[in-house]
């Protein structure tokens, strides 16, 4: 069976190596602005929060939206109740650093850089791009890396959404002081989704952390089920970008 995650990680190593040749870590550190508005400043535990994702393509389903640009999606989300935006910078999702920069220039909401972090370099790169938060996927990092990258992220003035998919991932995340834990309903090997993944993992989660259900949310009923189960918010991409009325769908999922 095709392992999409393994393919992405293998290619990511080459992408990061090329980025380092173009702009060294020392160069990035010299350009970083120390001021940063963190994810946690607007994304609060106890409230219902929608992270709306600017995603044009999926490795499993191909093109998801051919009508809107990433910045157009970002404006729709910001105007209709999203607490935060997730912007892909990985080419498998038609994402790029240039897209992130464009959104950062036009949007005031905090931004999550959505990518596959395998090297500390990417954390500094995210800060240079203007990210308020990064995604750390427990599945592709060792326990030591996960903890180290979390502290590096904080030292740069950003927050981290630590992503888990099963009990082993959850155990690794809970062994760190991570504030935000995202339960990915998408199996990163097959890219199939089900919100049952979140419902099954919630009993193993620390309810003192801010818990986000990621992917597979398509209706207000899905969102309400997750909220009632104990989630503090959702991260939604396909469920927004493929909607007939993206603005109306954003409002529905943001106002649960």
Label every model-predicted segment:
Residues 54, 61-161, 167-172, 198-201:
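N-terminal active-site wall of soluble small-molecule enzyme domains
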Residues 128-145, 182-190, 231-249:
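Glycine-rich phosphate-binding active-site loops on the catalytic face of alpha/beta enzymes
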């Amino acid at each position: 069976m095709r392992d999409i995650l393994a393919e992405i990680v293998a290619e990511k190593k080459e992408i990061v190596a090329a980025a380092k040749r173009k702009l060294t870590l020392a160069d990035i550190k010299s350009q970083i602005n120390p001021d940063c508005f963190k994810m946690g400043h607007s994304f609060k535990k106890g409230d219902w929060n929608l992270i709306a994702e600017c995603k044009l393509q999926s490795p499993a389903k191909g093109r998801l939206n051919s009508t809107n640009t990433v910045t157009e999606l970002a404006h729709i989300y910001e105007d209709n109740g999203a607490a935060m935006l997730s912007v892909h910078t990985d080419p498998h999702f038609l994402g790029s650093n240039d897209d992130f920069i464009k959104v950062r220039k036009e949007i005031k909401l905090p931004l999550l850089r959505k990518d596959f972090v395998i090297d500390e370099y990417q954390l500094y790169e995210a800060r240079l791009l203007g990210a308020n938060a990064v995604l750390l996927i427990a599945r592709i990092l060792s326990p030591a890396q996960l903890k180290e990258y979390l502290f590096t992220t904080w030292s740069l003035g950003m927050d981290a959404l630590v992503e888990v998919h099963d009990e082993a991932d959850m155990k690794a995340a809970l062994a760190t002081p991570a504030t935000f834990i995202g339960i990915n309903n998408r199996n990163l090997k097959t890219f199939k989704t089900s919100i049952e993944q979140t419902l099954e993992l919630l009993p193993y989660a620390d309810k003192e952390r801010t818990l986000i259900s990621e992917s597979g949310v398509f209706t207000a009923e899905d969102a309400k089920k997750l909220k009632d189960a104990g989630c503090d918010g959702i991260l939604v991409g396909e469920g927004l970008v493929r909607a007939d009325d993206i603005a109306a769908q954003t409002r529905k999922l943001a106002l649960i």
